[in-house]
Amino acid sequence: MNSTSTVRQPGGPRQQRRHTPKANLSDLYQRAFKEAWVKLNPKIMVKNPVMFMVWVGTLITGMLTLNPNLFGVTGTSAMFNGLVTVILLFTVLFANFAEAVAEGRGKAQADALRSTQTQTYAQRILADGSLEMVSSTHLRKGDRIVVSVGDIIPADGEVLEGVASVDESAITGESAPVLKEPGSDVASSVTGGTRIISDELIIRVTADPGKGFIDRMIDLVEGAERSKTPNEIALTVLLAVLTLVFLIVVATLPPPANYIDSPVSITLLIALLVALIPTTIGGLLSAIGIAGMDRVAQFNVVATSGRAVEACGDINTLVLDKTGTITLGNRLAETFLPVNGHSLKEVAAIALAASIFDTTPEGKSIVRLAEKMGATLDFDRQQAEGVEFSARTRMSGTDLPDGSEVRKGAVDAIRGFVRSRGGKSPTGLDEAYGKVSHLGGTPLAVCRNDEIYGVIYLKDIIKPGIQERFNQLRRMGVRTVMLTGDNRITASVIAKEAGVDDFIAEATPEDKIQVIQQEQAAGKLVAMTGDGTNDAPALAQANVGLAMNSGTQAAKEAANMVDLDSDPTKLIDLVTIGKQLLITRGALTTFSLANDIAKYFAIIPAMFAGIGIGALNIMDLKSPQSAVLSALIYNALIIPALIPLALRGVKFRPLSADQLLQRNILVYGLGGIIVPFVAIKLIDLGISLL
């Protein structure tokens, strides 16, 4: 159907914002409980070698419950076998429940993202300029559409015309509207599912239905199978080897036990095996990995894989853009500094002419400052032509109708431009350049043809608290490198004030890749942020690439993490989360292995009670049966008891690796020995009262 364009003006009925729904804990636990039973499928259980052995043991003791003499006379009753079976079954279920809860939280995030997607109608612009109302499912990449106040943007796209405020709270959770306009990579990118709350935009669709940003995020979050990280695989292999070794040890016990006339029942052998193998970390390992991705999601960051989250914890070098990460964002024109005898008004007029086609926030601030000083254009803008900034020339400007060329840019670039036209560097330029640089600002020179008129002072403000965050990273052994297009003096001042370890001035996009490659060649893992198309190669090269949701499609596709809030500083938080993931896994592994000591002292004396090794019963457990049941009950209950810690993570402290290791051994090693001794004794006392 064809129609004419009708533009709804601001001031109409206020649209109610949708908020990302939170997962209902009751529903989450109910689904996790059901999923725990589903995961008893042997095809699923075999993926976790530790819990698979417990599962097999459950089947065997279950058969012995039905027929205690199935494998010959064992000396254990059906009642005892049944109790062991129930305890082992719950051990497996608790491990499955931990994984299901972690997975459920990820699925809740996918549901929240999916809730932002609604089938809407869009006004598609046809070749003759007329409008056609179509369903959002019929839009294709390259289509041009019109969206007005109150409309939900039907697909990912790029703003071609117009300026409007967009409510992105459905995706980012941030209530403040975001200004969208053509020009810069960041401001011109829009995401399907967000809402126009003022004015009108003409957008070019950049993704087919089902292939937009939100669709990709949903696919990543609820992928059919979470791929394990290298460290997780290594730990799984270690646990599998330990399980095999202990299985061989247990399997070789019956002959010597029979020889000393102290036969051991199959049920007791299974109990010993379960006590020997590291069931605690085996039951929580998957949950820890999934929870790491979930903690990242709670920061409104979507990771493409657990590998990316884990890599954050191993990062040695952070490569950070100055603007937006270390400083508050867009530099703003503060004042003009005339040189070569020119007046302030003359500099303002040339700066206005050089910036009139510049749609960046910096360019607009120069225009505002010049107009505030009374500057006006002395040419017809329609007959002039804008010259865009490029990383190669490091300047931009305007070609005037009379053939004159006005330019603004890096001081050395403008010097070269003027000299190429027969001019020379004027007196006072170096002084103005140095003055701005020593203030930590960015100096831009402005010229007309072969004459430099003055310097523009662009002011940068360091983000509050950023120095302390860099100090924390330094204590963790992470090196920070600031990249900036500023000159060396300005870069040095800002680097010193911010507290970064190193900086690269007058950097180009190629420099980012070189820095990353140099660090990686030295065996370092590198993380960086980016939002523009020119950042995409470096984001792909980095071990951790964090793209901004407000950035270009190319940047988001190259990165392995996307920040829905578009906050570059969040990369520092991700390093902390990654280290917390590794520390949590290490702490619970230490605790699990230390637990085994108490379980040995409970079960081994019970197995060989007839040969007089009562001295090993240091916990004074009441009976062999009570000792076995107490150890197995503790073994089962410790898994759900540690689920909150596995999901939340061990509290992170910015310490060195040696300090973290010492603390890990003291808290989780010593604690892993003491806690089970106390708990098993208390359980034994409880059983004796029954």
Curated annotation (Swiss-Prot):
Disulfide bonds: none annotated. Gene3D superfamilies: Calcium-transporting ATPase, cytoplasmic domain N, Calcium-transporting ATPase, cytoplasmic transduction domain A, HAD superfamily/HAD-like. The keyword NADP does not apply. It is an enzyme of class 7 (translocase). Residues 1-23 are annotated as: Disordered. It is found in: Cell inner membrane. GO terms for biological process: potassium ion transmembrane transport. Its EC number is 7.2.2.6. It catalyses: K(+)(out) + ATP + H2O = K(+)(in) + ADP + phosphate + H(+). Mg(2+) binds at D531, D535. One of its GO terms (cellular component) is potassium:proton antiporter complex. It is a multi-pass membrane protein. Keywords: ATP-binding, Cell inner membrane, Cell membrane, Ion transport, Magnesium, Membrane, Metal-binding, Nucleotide-binding, Phosphoprotein, Potassium, Potassium transport, Translocase, Transmembrane, Transmembrane helix, Transport. Its main location: membrane. One of its GO terms (molecular function) is ATP binding. Part of the high-affinity ATP-driven potassium transport (or Kdp) system, which catalyzes the hydrolysis of ATP coupled with the electrogenic transport of potassium into the cytoplasm. This subunit is responsible for energy coupling to the transport system and for the release of the potassium ions to the cytoplasm. The system is composed of three essential subunits: KdpA, KdpB and KdpC. This is Potassium-transporting ATPase ATP-binding subunit. It comes from Synechocystis sp. (strain ATCC 27184 / PCC 6803 / Kazusa). The gene is kdpB.
